[in-house]
Curated annotation (Swiss-Prot):
Disulfide bonds: none annotated. It comes from the Eukaryota. Residues 175-271, 353-447 form the PH domain. Tyrosine phosphorylated (by SRC). It holds the Pfam family PH. This is Actin filament-associated protein 1-like 2. Its main location: cytoplasm. Residues 62-163, 571-614, 757-801 are annotated as: Disordered. Interacts with SRC. Interacts with LCK when tyrosine phosphorylated. SMART domains: PH (SM00233). The lineage of its organism: Eukaryota, Metazoa, Chordata, Craniata, Vertebrata. One of its GO terms (cellular component) is plasma membrane. One of its GO terms (biological process) is positive regulation of epidermal growth factor receptor signaling pathway.
Length: 825
């Protein structure tokens, strides 16, 4: 009996010693020996248990008074029984026992649960392992058909690590750094237990220990690895391995010690500096970020519980899943809905519009936390999630703030927001492109005049700096265009101070003024009729020299030289004479002293009464009317409103002149913008060709660098590579500016092709005065009101207030732009 007790104690001590060795860093030979001892100990323990059960079921009672003992009275652990003489205290039979069958290699399992009647297929849903991460509901479509023949039912009673069995091929473990049976996550969210071996720099995964060809063979050189820990019943530790040129690999481990051991081995193989085993620490080279960008895009805005631990270093507590969901068979309706939703979001265009919100890591109380950041109205808002249901912290005002990159080895794409030298927030992006995008957004909202190229980037890689600067400039320019895009209803309105510059670059058409012959003029209007004279519109084309008459003396000095004839180019309203009817207007020449005295009186009386912009317009037009034309000009004649004859011919001729003027202006603008567009397109093609050539030279230079061994030549090649990188950045910047210029020229070309009237704005004719005179009582004041001054019809149309305008399709375009702005915000 002492021998059996010593043997039992030896087995216990050996088991404890093997557990201690699990926490040590052993060589490959020691690992193999330890795994062999663990397997032998497990086999001996199982075989002794099976022998005990067999003997217990077949034992006989020596005394008739003794009955079979119940199972509860028999101790669970007994030493192996040997044949001997029967005694009163021995329950073994007298004769030798038959040869026992070899114990089966079946690991212990708990009592199987009886499947429910309503879900006969629940057995497949309960296959080990069942749990999934929170965001994997829509991915569990298959039922793991290929893993039915695997050992998936082993529980925690066995050894902490399941090592390869003795019948496994020794070649699988030869020269292996580490090997064990681990869970490997497949592409549909399934988990399969496979034999994972790290040999040299490669990770090999076998379906079973008897296979000779691996299911997965990946080179771990240059790969990154992240350790994640979750408080769940199974697979509480995961390793996410991101190789250089392969898909992401997720391994499930049973304990933290095993996870740390595998993490240390993988980091040694990958050649990356050790980051420790703490959760959330990871080191991802920039080249790997560029190569493995595609598989990570779909996970960009998913929960961090899928493949990574929380940013603040605390393990996440998964949501409690419904028990009914585990027992039911097949794919749930919620899974189908989630699956469709994920597919629809992945098919959306990545750059639907200028994105002003995304997930960023925010430093809060010395801990990094993931927050949904949103920029609006020069404020940076922080939310717990993208639904904006809960505010994480108070909004941050960006006005007057500075944005500075602040990279570190652990956080490559972090940047700070400062106000008067005081740090307000520290943020971190997920990639160089996203960092540049947010730098441009924040610089635009803060009102800073700093160019993204002027910021200090502490990066060695020139491509990374170029990517950040390019993304920052793009988002900065897009923000400027978004909030300063042209408004066709307020942009380009003529200034009141420079009315003369509107048509300076357009060929002046012939001046047409139609007037009735002098002999057909009616007598003067009756002075007692009391009718107020109507406003008279002279269809004169404005010329630059007309409006640049600086003084009234110069304008009046030219009046005596004008002969008293009917072919003068000015028509004024005159006080009606007695004895005439209101329907008979009278035309006086500008040579009459009454007319010459009345014009200064109108100007002098109008200026102190209404010092408004309208007076300036009337004065300017009054100066414009004092223009003399030579008597031998056949096309220049004085015009007066005639009620007796229809003015159809006059209107047609005036309209044709104005249309000709607008047509000439439109053709000139269309031609100019078309030439500008063609020139920019040619420059764009040249820049593209130059960029392609530079990139080709850069690629060839990199290949030469890889093959070169001479240090002197290597330094020269690196210097040349830096110059080519700088040229690429400059050409890319020129290309971006050129693209924006082309877009602006195209918009101007469309406006020019639409015609002289901006965006279909029409003039309401009901607000315009009729050309025919109407009988009205004469004003009591001797001086006529300022409105009686003759004005130019073209100038009046241009200076008419916006309230007179009737917007047709322009209203539709304006509303469409407002809706677009609302949708973008």
């Amino acid at each position: 009996m002492e021998r059996y007790k010593a043997l039992e104690q030896l087995l216990t001590e050996l088991d404890d010693f093997l557990k201690v060795l699990d926490q040590e860093n052993l060589s490959s030979a020691a690992v193999l020996k330890k795994s062999g001892l663990s397997e032998l100990l497990r086999l001996y323990t199982k075989s002794s248990s099976s022998d005990e059960e067999y003997i217990y079921m077949n034992k006989v009672s020596v005394n008739g008074e003794q009955n079979s003992a119940s199972p509860d009275k028999v101790p669970e652990e007994q030493g192996p029984l040997t044949n001997g003489e029967p005694s009163q205290h021995s329950s073994a039979p007298q004769k030798s026992l038959p040869d026992l069958p070899p114990p089966k290699m079946i690991p212990e399992r708990k009592q199987p649960t009886v499947p429910k009647i309503e879900s006969p297929e629940g057995y497949y849903e309960e296959a080990e392992p069942f749990d999934r991460s929170i965001n994997e509901d829509g991915e569990a479509v298959s039922s793991s058909y290929e893993s039915y023949d695997e050992d998936e039912n082993s529980k925690g009673k066995a050894a902490p690590y399941q090592w390869p069995s003795p019948e496994a091929s020794i070649e699988l473990m030869r020269d292996a750094r580490i090997c064990a049976f681990l869970w490997r996550k497949k592409w549909l969210g399934q988990w399969a237990k496979q034999l994972c071996v790290i040999r040299d720099t490669r990770l090999l995964c076998y379906k079973s220990s008897k296979d000779h060809s691996p299911q997965l063979d990946v080179n771990l050189r240059g790969s990154s690895v992240v350790h994640k820990e979750k408080q769940v019943r199974k697979k509480g530790h995961k390793l996410k391995i991101t190789p250089m040129n392969a898909d992401v690999i997720v391994l499930g481990l049973q304990s933290k010690d095993q996870a740390e051991q595998w993490l240390r081995v993988i980091q040694e193989v990958s050649g990356l500096p050790s980051e420790g085993a703490s959760e959330g620490n990871q080191y991802t080279p920039d080249a790997q970020r560029l190569n493995c960008q595609k598989p990570d895009i779909a996970e960009k805005y998913l929960s961090a519980a899928e493949y990574g631990i929380t940013i603040n270093g605390h393990p996440e507590i998964p949501e409690t899943k419904d028990v009914k969901k585990k027992c039911s068979a097949g794919l749930k309706l919620s899974n189908l809905m989630n699956l469709g939703r994920k597919k629809s979001t992945s098919l959306e265009p990545p750059e639907r519009s200028l994105e002003t919100s995304s997930y960023l890591n925010v430093l809060v109380n010395s801990q990094w936390k993931s927050r949904w950041c949103f920029v609006r109205d020069s404020h940076l808002h922080f939310y717990q999630d993208r639904n904006r249901s809960k505010v994480a912290q108070q909004p941050l005002s960006l006005v007057g703030c500075d944005v500075l990159p602040d990279p570190s080895p652990d956080h490559l794409y972090s940047f700070r927001i400062l106000h008067n030298g005081e740090e307000l927030a520290k943020l971190e992006a997920k990639s160089s492109e996203e960092m540049g995008h947010w730098l441009g957004l924040l610089l635009s909202e803060s009102g800073s005049k700093t160019d993204p190229e002027e910021l200090t980037y502490d990066y060695v890689d020139a491509e990374r700096v170029s990517c950040i600067v390019s993304a920052a400039k793009t988002s900065l320019l897009l923000m400027q265009r978004k909030f300063s895009e042209p408004n066709t209803y307020i942009d380009g309105l003529p200034s009141r101070d420079c009315q003369d510059d509107l048509y300076d670059d357009v060929e002046v058409s012939e001046l047409i003024a139609v007037v009735e012959p002098a002999e057909e003029a009616a007598p003067a209007v009756d002075a007692n009729s009391g009718s107020e004279p109507d406003r008279v519109y002279l269809d004169l084309t404005p010329v630059k020299s007309f409006l640049h008459s600086s003084s009234e003396a110069q304008a009046q000095a030219s009046l005596p030289a004008v002969p008293h004839q009917d072919d003068v180019a000015e028509t004024l309203t005159v006080d009606p004479k007695p004895g005439t009817t209101p329907e008979e207007p009278h035309t006086e020449s500008p040579g009459d002293p009454e007319v010459q005295q009345r014009q200064p009186e109108v100007q002098e009386s109008s200026e102190p009464i209404e010092p408004t912009p309208r007076i300036t317009m009337v004065k300017l037009q009054a100066e414009q009317q004092r223009i003399s034309f030579p008597a031998n000009c056949p096309d220049t004649m004085a015009s007066a409103p005639i009620a007796a004859s229809p003015p159809v011919k006059e209107k047609l001729r005036v309209t044709s002149a104005e249309i000709k003027l607008g047509k000439n202006r439109t053709e000139a603008e269309v031609k100019r913008y078309t030439e500008e567009k063609e020139r920019l397109e040619r420059s764009k093609e040249e820049i593209r060709g130059h960029l392609a050539q530079l990139r080709r030279e850069k690629r060839e230079l990199k290949e030469t660098l890889l093959r070169c061994t001479d240090k002197g030549v290597l330094a020269k090649l690196e210097q040349t590579l830096k110059k080519i990188d700088e040229e690429c950045r400059m050409e890319e910047s020129r290309r971006v500016d050129l693209e924006l210029s082309i877009m602006e020229v195209k918009d101007n070309l469309k406006k020019a092709e639409a015609g002289p009237v901006t965006l279909g704005t029409t003039v309401d004719t009901t607000h315009l005065d009729n050309m025919s005179p109407r009988p009205q009582p004469k004003a009591a004041t001797p001086n006529p009101p300022p409105d009686s001054t003759p004005v130019n019809s073209a100038s009046v149309l241009k200076n008419r207030p916006l309230s007179v305008m009737v917007t047709g399709k322009g209203t539709v375009l304006q509303k469409a732009k407002e809706w677009e702005k609302k949708g973008a915000s």
